[in-house]
Amino acid sequence: MSEIPAELRYASSHEWAKVEDGVATVGISDHAQDAMGDLVYVELPEVGQVVAAGDETGVVESVKAASDIYSPVSGEIVEINEALEDEPELVNNVPYEGGWLFKVQLTDEGELDSLLTADQYQAQIDSE
């Protein structure tokens, strides 16, 4: 069973967001990484790029599939996880810690209300 931390918010496209001081750390869920299998490559957005919620921001590739990454929130990309360039498997091993993808300076914290809670995300997974 996939881990779904209660303190995070989730997009229906399987990204998660954790907000601290107006900055959202974004990654893909344990469920998503498990479905993808062992990741071999992660393409991330550019620092300084401005994104809207739902914008495609990168790609994760495994030995069996490639999947687009979408930003669950709007704002400016302020940091990317450069460790993933050499160690994409961090997304598999620690998706909610060292496997985060990028950080976004939020332009509208109210968007978080449109994301799923852990219980809502679990219900979505169960219905897939």
From Swiss-Prot:
Q: Which cysteines are joined by disulfide bonds?
A: none
**Which Pfam families has this protein been placed in?**
GCV_H (PF01597)
State the source organism's domain of life: Bacteria
One example of a Gene Ontology biological process annotation: glycine decarboxylation via glycine cleavage system
> What SUPFAM superfamilies does the database record attribute to this sequence?
Single hybrid motif
Keywords in alphabetical order, please.
Lipoyl
Annotated InterPro entries: Biotin_lipoyl, GCV_H, GCV_H/Fam206, GCV_H_sub, Single_hybrid_motif
A cellular component term, taken from the record's GO annotations? cytosol
Cofactor(s) of this protein: (R)-lipoate
The UniProt subunit note reads as follows: The glycine cleavage system is composed of four proteins: P, T, L and H.
Record note on cofactor: Binds 1 lipoyl cofactor covalently.
This protein is called: Glycine cleavage system H protein
Spell out which residues are annotated as carrying N6-lipoyllysine: 64
Coiled-coil positions are: none
Domain annotation Lipoyl-binding: ranges: 23-105
The function of this protein is: The glycine cleavage system catalyzes the degradation of glycine. The H protein shuttles the methylamine group of glycine from the P protein to the T protein.
